[in-house]
């Protein structure tokens, strides 16, 4: 079993986007700590299974971030369950999770499942629009969500999601200072090694996603930048 607490860098792959076998091999053999499979729209059991089978040719740990109950399948090392703490819709905070537990609760391996407390901060992002996230937050608001995840809900992961735009480094630093047990994940807008290294100063885990599809070479350079190898 892998220890997610030591992961510094992960790639996130969208099953609804095209990725060549060559580029997938580069990602999986890059030295990243894990590959997360997940997306906001167009996620189906078929494209999730296709991605799973492709990644399983390699030794890298593989995580399914669950956004649709219908796309859950066995075979991943871990399952991340996002709860969008700043969503205006209860279904994205606990509703979908309740449905999943009704359907799969009896067969879940709880050692493989981790809840993520998301705070979505880019109003233009698909995930913000889908979940109706309240993104016009002050730093105090964000820190309060971090405390909620860390101290009240005791979630293992607090995820600052800027999805498509580069975030506020000072805010990431201040959020990290508040967390006692939750690991801080940062995702959003990382387009080069310098940005990845900057966020890695404060985030426990840096998530690199969109740049994979735009500039694979820059994406690969983020691994060493984050892990200092």
Curated annotation (Swiss-Prot):
GO terms for biological process: glycerophospholipid biosynthetic process. It holds the Pfam family PcrB. InterPro entries: GGGP/HepGP_synthase_I, GGGP/HepGP_synthase_sf, GGGP_HepGP_synthase. Belongs to the GGGP/HepGP synthase family. Group I subfamily. It comes from Bacillus cereus (strain ATCC 14579 / DSM 31 / CCUG 7414 / JCM 2152 / NBRC 15305 / NCIMB 9373 / NCTC 2599 / NRRL B-3711). HAMAP family: GGGP_HepGP_synthase. The keyword Magnesium applies. Homodimer. It is an enzyme of class 2 (transferase). Coiled coil: none annotated. This is Heptaprenylglyceryl phosphate synthase. Pathway: Membrane lipid metabolism; glycerophospholipid metabolism. Keywords: Lipid biosynthesis, Lipid metabolism, Magnesium, Metal-binding, Phospholipid biosynthesis, Phospholipid metabolism, Transferase. Prenyltransferase that catalyzes in vivo the transfer of the heptaprenyl moiety of heptaprenyl pyrophosphate (HepPP; 35 carbon atoms) to the C3 hydroxyl of sn-glycerol-1-phosphate (G1P), producing heptaprenylglyceryl phosphate (HepGP). This reaction is an ether-bond-formation step in the biosynthesis of archaea-type G1P-based membrane lipids found in Bacillales. Its cofactor is Mg(2+). It catalyses: sn-glycerol 1-phosphate + all-trans-heptaprenyl diphosphate = 3-heptaprenyl-sn-glycero-1-phosphate + diphosphate. Sn-glycerol 1-phosphate binds at residues 12, 159-164, 189, 209-210. It comes from the Bacteria. One of its GO terms (molecular function) is heptaprenylglyceryl phosphate synthase activity. Mg(2+) binds at residues 14, 40. Transmembrane segments: none annotated.
